[in-house]
Amino acid sequence: MSENRLAAKLTKVDKAAILLLSLGETDAAQVLRHMGPKEVQRVGVAMASMRNVHREQVEQVMGEFVEVVGDQTSLGVGADGYIRKMLTQALGEDKANNLIDRILLGGSTSGLDSLKWMEPRAVADVIRYEHPQIQAIVVAYLDPDQAAEVLSHFDHKVRLDIVLRVSSLNTVQPSALKELNLILEKQFAGNSNATRTTMGGVKRAADIMNYLDSSIEGQLMDSIREVDEDLSGQIEDLMFVFDNLADVDDRGIQALLREVSSDVLVLALKGSDEAIREKVFKNMSKRAAELLRDDLEAKGPVRVSEVEGAQKEILTIARRMAESGDIVLGGKGGEEMI
């Protein structure tokens, strides 16, 4: 088999994994230091799954790297909480720990950036007794899924205050970021260089709300509506909910269905409106659609929480696919969310 055909089977993430596995630990750490937690997690997954890589593939990847060495590649997303686990599977516990330590202690990671590598509960503990505005800045700085998990470790009153503050954030002055980094760097190494940073806002609040459990999301939205009805409307307009899947194009729905198990799909559709059901049926084979209809009819009563859980699972998959460019989503107000 030719080198080109071998390399053609590799994704960009696979090639990145091969490249890093070919480097020494120190050099790999230098490369990974310039990636975010999600990028490292995805490369770590690829490294863990590498089996029987041909010498020709390694040579081809190296050759391509030399040709495009000046380019930057965005590697997509994954779950932050599993980074250490995935790197351990890929490299072994000692090497994974050394690699992560080098990334975090290498001198280019700010205190805020270090929080992205921590478990959500640990982040919540770090900021629990800080001023509410500091809590809001930290939550706005995190990726929406991690931010939502951090919020879940606070009581409702604190969650409401943080989300309202995130919604009103626009830009953060360098002096404020520098002070916050200094506070955090008492525990984490890094530098405190800062530029005027855009973070927060209604869109960020909506993104975070999207990742909250349904019960927390509903309670929080009700409270926001009581405080500021106009703001709650703006947030809702930018949120993406299950019924919005009816507006996703056919190719996107087909791609999404390939990633969703039939059991989860049946549960999710039990609580959906007719438009989303027809959208799903339309994008399945005739036989598969008939089987799904039969499963829906045969399915007995289910708890609302089970339906909401299944819908959240599908939405999580959809958002991940949107962030990697596989599908395009739109919020209630039709604004594009990539």
From Swiss-Prot:
Source domain of life: Bacteria
Motif Part of the EHPQR-motif boundaries: 130-133
Signal peptide stretch: none
Record's keyword terms, sorted: Bacterial flagellum, Cell inner membrane, Cell membrane, Chemotaxis, Flagellar rotation, Membrane
Site (Part of the EHPQR-motif): 165
Location(s) in or outside the cell: Cell inner membrane; Bacterial flagellum basal body
Bilayer topology annotation: Peripheral membrane protein
InterPro entries: Flg_Motor_Flig, Flg_Motor_Flig_C, FliG_a-hlx, FliG_M, FliG_N
Metal-binding listed as a keyword: no
An annotated GO cellular component: plasma membrane
GO molecular function: cytoskeletal motor activity
A Pfam family that the UniProt record links to this protein: FliG_M
Annotated SUPFAM superfamilies: FliG
GO biological-process terms attached to the record: bacterial-type flagellum-dependent cell motility; chemotaxis
Similarity field: Belongs to the FliG family.
Function: FliG is one of three proteins (FliG, FliN, FliM) that forms the rotor-mounted switch complex (C ring), located at the base of the basal body. This complex interacts with the CheY and CheZ chemotaxis proteins, in addition to contacting components of the motor that determine the direction of flagellar rotation.
Protein name per the record: Flagellar motor switch protein FliG
Origin species: Pseudomonas aeruginosa (strain ATCC 15692 / DSM 22644 / CIP 104116 / JCM 14847 / LMG 12228 / 1C / PRS 101 / PAO1)
